[in-house]
């Protein structure tokens, strides 16, 4: 099977669409409810200071590609950690009204529903930026009911699955990984699918998973109205905050 190049996806077309259907207010912020010109507005939770987050992202992006020192972070802290801190702050700000927080986990990812005293927690694995994007994609797809269930009520079998279990796993993962792909590309990060099957004892060479994820991502770009609302919200923020930096930095 040929290698799938996810960078070929026209992410700029999606960025242009999202920005063209969204208005900034005079303070260069995304307001409480993003105002769309061609479809109903969707809630964002609070005013988002685009300049603040964009300035930080520009510094982080510059450091990551040119290894230049940053003014506001210690040289002993990794860029990955700073990017994760930035993402947590952005996510928690954007979705403040959703009673959910993004949490750096020490172990495997897990979702904990909100309680009477604590917000829901999206815990991603080992502090990795990519894991955070993946778990956010699952959250964005989960409806109101599944967000009340531990791990969204998902069935999960660990690595070492049977061939039938692997096929079921891949079927469930197509849309989350397609959304993760769009998040990644909008942030200028690389993306590759995860089949999570390092210990498979069967032939995986005929799997169509990668191309299925590619086609689903392509479908979301061509029909952005089919994106989950919260995924669309975050992609819109990334389009304003991250994508211009990527385009001018290449």
Regions found by a protein language model. Give the residues of each.
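Active-site recognition of the HExxH zinc-binding catalytic motif
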Residues: 130-143
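Pan-zinc metallopeptidase signature
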Residues: 3-4, 195, 199-250
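An active-site-proximal "capping" alpha-helix that borders the catalytic cofactor pocket
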Residues: 170-186
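Post-HEXXH active-site segment of zinc metalloproteases
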Residues: 142-173, 195-200
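Short pre-active-site segment immediately N-terminal to the catalytic Zn-binding motif
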Residues: 115-131
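N-terminal secretory/membrane-targeting helices
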Residues: 97, 101, 185, 242-249
């Amino acid at each position: 099977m040929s290698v799938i190049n996810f960078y070929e996806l026209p992410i700029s077309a999606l960025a242009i669409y999202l920005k063209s259907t969204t208005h900034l207010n005079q303070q260069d912020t995304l307001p409480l409810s993003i105002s769309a010109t061609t479809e109903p507005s969707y809630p964002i939770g609070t005013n988002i200071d685009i300049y603040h987050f964009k300035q930080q992202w520009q510094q982080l992006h510059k450091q990551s590609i040119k290894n230049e020192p940053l003014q506001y972070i210690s040289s002993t802290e990794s860029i990955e950690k700073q990017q994760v801190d930035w993402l947590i702050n952005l996510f928690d700000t954007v979705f403040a009204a959703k009673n959910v927080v993004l949490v750096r986990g020490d172990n495997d990812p897990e979702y904990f529903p909100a309680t009477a005293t604590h917000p829901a927690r999206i815990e991603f694995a080992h502090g990795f930026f990519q894991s955070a994007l993946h778990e956010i994609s699952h959250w964005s797809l989960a409806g109101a009911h599944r967000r009340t269930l531990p791990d969204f009520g998902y069935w999960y079998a660990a690595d070492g699955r049977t061939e039938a279990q692997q096929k079921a796993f891949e079927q469930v993962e197509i849309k989350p990984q397609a959304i993760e792909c769009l998040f990644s590309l909008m942030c200028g990060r690389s993306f590759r699918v995860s089949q999570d099957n390092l210990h498979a004892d069967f032939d995986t060479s005929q799997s169509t998973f990668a191309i299925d994820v590619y086609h689903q991502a392509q479908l979301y770009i061509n029909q952005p109205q089919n994106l989950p609302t919260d995924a669309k919200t975050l992609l819109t923020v990334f389009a304003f905050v991250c994508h211009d930096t990527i385009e001018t930095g290449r």
